[in-house]
């Protein structure tokens, strides 16, 4: 049986490869994505695909997990919540920029496309 952490690693690998198809294969048809770089809630596969098509077109796109921040919470036998912090990197106008973001997922490992909910937001500056 797959572990929830493996879903996250598959997702990160797909981001690093810029593979929209591999990303979409992880999102259930009912999935909701609250993305890092959008002010919209995406609850249709078409809008999730459009978001990742735009994001994956970025030069030097990568993502790195801050391993010590990852927490996995079992909600039932097959359903898990995960949260933590990762760092997006990509180039804008030739300059490589980094964006720290907090994330949460709800995954159902009994489904072929296990991601049901994914929220990611840039970490704001402290007041």
Regions found by a protein language model. Give the residues of each.
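A short, structured loop/turn motif at beta-sheet edges
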Residues: 72-80, 107-114
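Short, solvent-exposed loop/turn segments at secondary-structure boundaries
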Residues: 37, 93-96
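Hydrophobic/aromatic beta-strand elements that line small-molecule binding cavities or substrate pockets
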Residues: 52, 67-72, 86-88, 101-108
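Short, aromatic-enriched amphipathic alpha-helices that serve as compact interaction elements
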Residues: 1-18, 26
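Short beta-strand edge/turn micro-motifs at domain boundaries
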Residues: 98-127
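A generic structural micro-feature
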Residues: 61-64, 76-80, 95-99
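A solvent-exposed, acidic/Ser-Thr-rich amphipathic alpha-helical stretch
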Residues: 2, 20-74
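A short hydrophobic beta-strand element
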Residues: 78-88
